[in-house]
Amino acid sequence: MLPIRECVSQTPGYVPGEQPQTTDYIKLNTNENPYPPPDKIFEGLQQELTKVRLYPDPVSTQLRKAAANVFGISYQNILAGNGSDDILNIAVRTFVNPGEVVAFLDLTYSLYETIARVHGASIVQIPTNNQFELNGPIICPEAKLIFVASPNPPVGKHLNRDYLEETCKQATGVVLIDEAYVDFSDENHLDFLEKYDNVIISRTMSKSYSLAGMRVGFGVSSTEIIEQMDKVRDSYNLDRIAQTLGTAVLNYQDYFKGVWQQVRHTRTRLIESLRTLEFLVFDSDSNFVLASPQWIAASDLYTQLKERKVLVRYFSHPRIKDYVRISIGTDQEIDRLLEAIHEIKGSN
C-alpha cells in the first residue's frame, strides 16, 4: 500500500471549471477576463525567450516593483506568487502547524478547504446567512489563519467592511483577505495593512489583468510577514515569461481601468436582462453573477446551455444547487447567452 498521508487521501481534490478543447464555445464558466491584454506587452518577450536556459530572478524584483507602484507601497511589502493560489498555500505552510485551525466561510472559494486539509489543519467553517453574508465579525480565537474573500465567491459581493475590520482587530492569528475580484468594484482593503500587523492581502493577475494563463499573483503585508513567507516560497516560483508579462501589463493601468469599466457595464446589463427573464440574481462586485432561474432547474439550464455551446458554472453544493454562476463576457458573448436562454425558456 502506498504511504499516502491520511489528510491527503481523505481530502476531495479541487474541481476546476471545464476547459474545452475546441474554440466554438462561449466560455462563461471560469471568470476569465474576456478582453486580451495590449499587444505591446509582448514586445520584450522575444529577448526573454533567448534566455530560457537561465534561471529567472528568484524573487521577481521588477514584477514586485511594478506592483508596488500600483498598490502605493514598498516592493518589500510584496511577495510574488505563481498565481494567488500559491500565496494561499504559502500562508498555510507559514502559519499553521498540523492540527491547528484554519477558518473560512461556509460558502466561499473551495480551494481554501482543500489547501488546509492537505496540510493537516483542522477546519472551522463560519456560517453565513441566507443572503450568503456575514452575520457579524468572524470571532475564532483558536484560528491561526482566517481566509476571507471580498468580494466573496460564488456570490460575488463584498463582505461588510466593518465586520472585516473588526475581524482583523479581534483575530489572534493571521487574516488573509483574498481580493481576486477587487478591481471590478470601488473598494479594497489595502488600508487595513496600515492598522493591523496580522493582515495579508492577496491579489491575482488572472481576472482583472487578463493573465490567467500565466499564473501571477501577490501577497501584500508587513515586511515581517513577507520575510517569513518568503522562506516557504518555492525557489524560482515564477518563470521568466510570467515575470516579464506581469511587469509589462502593470504599466497599462489606463487600458485595464477601461476594461474593468466595460465589464461592470456589461455586468449591469446582464443582471437586468436575467431579472427580466425571471431569474433571481444577486448584485455583484465581481466579474460574474450568481443567478437562479425560477422556471427550470439550474442543473438543467446548465446542461441545455452547454448543448448550445455556452458554458456556465454549476455547483452541486446544497446551498447553491438552484443557481448557476455566469462570468461576464464581451457584449457579443452575453448576447449569445441571452439568446440561448430565450430559446430554452420558450421550449419549457
Swiss-Prot record:
Residues modified to N6-(pyridoxal phosphate)lysine: 207
Key words, A-Z: Amino-acid biosynthesis, Aminotransferase, Histidine biosynthesis, Pyridoxal phosphate, Transferase
Enzyme Commission (EC) number: 2.6.1.9
GO biological process, one term: L-histidine biosynthetic process
Record-linked SUPFAM superfamilies: PLP-dependent transferases
Keyword Transferase: yes
Co-factor(s): pyridoxal 5'-phosphate
Keyword Amino-acid biosynthesis among record annotations: yes
HAMAP family registered for this protein in UniProt: HisC_aminotrans_2
Identification of the protein by name: Histidinol-phosphate aminotransferase
